[in-house]
């Protein structure tokens, strides 16, 4: 009986489209079809910091199909995305020193990965946050929410 409940919980978490920051870290995959493997990242407020581990599971190079993961307040998402285009590939499509950016990984190509540590005290419970890929044109399909729980 207990094992069937555990299996049910595991299956529900697999199909929820959400990734819980187990152990205060999150593994997110991006692919050549311009998709992340999740639409939501749940962060426990008890974490002092959490790590976002981004892995590009595709094979295309970063100048063609590069991906990153940028976290901003949802209200700042579009402006940060637009300003990132001007930064170009050399700037990881993130404006240098942009205070609206909570955290971001570097731009990675197929088979590459990067990680970034996020100070959870910078995330306010109740505030809406968005994570997205700032490579030009990708954010329409590659974005989700960060929720502090």
UniProtKB/Swiss-Prot annotation:
<feature type="disulfide bond">
    <location>
        <begin position="24"/>
        <end position="47"/>
    </location>
</feature>
<dbReference type="GO" id="GO:0005507">
    <property type="term" value="F:copper ion binding"/>
</dbReference>
<dbReference type="GO" id="GO:0042597">
    <property type="term" value="C:periplasmic space"/>
</dbReference>
<feature type="binding site">
    <location>
        <position position="142"/>
    </location>
    <ligand>
        <name>Cu cation</name>
    </ligand>
</feature>
<keyword id="KW-0813">Transport</keyword>
<dbReference type="InterPro" id="IPR014068">
    <property type="entry name" value="Azurin"/>
</dbReference>
<dbReference type="InterPro" id="IPR050845">
    <property type="entry name" value="Cu-binding_ET"/>
</dbReference>
<keyword id="KW-0479">Metal-binding</keyword>
<dbReference type="InterPro" id="IPR000923">
    <property type="entry name" value="BlueCu_1"/>
</dbReference>
<protein>
    <recommendedName>
        <fullName>Azurin iso-1</fullName>
    </recommendedName>
</protein>
<dbReference type="InterPro" id="IPR008972">
    <property type="entry name" value="Cupredoxin"/>
</dbReference>
<dbReference type="Pfam" id="PF00127">
    <property type="entry name" value="Copper-bind"/>
</dbReference>
<comment type="function">
    <text>This methylothroph organism uses azurin in the electron transport chain involved in methylamine/methanol oxidation.</text>
</comment>
<keyword id="KW-0249">Electron transport</keyword>
<feature type="signal peptide">
    <location>
        <begin position="1"/>
        <end position="21"/>
    </location>
</feature>
<feature type="domain" description="Plastocyanin-like">
    <location>
        <begin position="22"/>
        <end position="149"/>
    </location>
</feature>
<dbReference type="GO" id="GO:0009055">
    <property type="term" value="F:electron transfer activity"/>
</dbReference>
<feature type="binding site">
    <location>
        <position position="133"/>
    </location>
    <ligand>
        <name>Cu cation</name>
    </ligand>
</feature>
<keyword id="KW-0186">Copper</keyword>
<keyword id="KW-0732">Signal</keyword>
<keyword id="KW-1015">Disulfide bond</keyword>
<feature type="binding site">
    <location>
        <position position="138"/>
    </location>
    <ligand>
        <name>Cu cation</name>
    </ligand>
</feature>
<keyword id="KW-0574">Periplasm</keyword>
<dbReference type="InterPro" id="IPR028871">
    <property type="entry name" value="BlueCu_1_BS"/>
</dbReference>
<feature type="binding site">
    <location>
        <position position="67"/>
    </location>
    <ligand>
        <name>Cu cation</name>
    </ligand>
</feature>
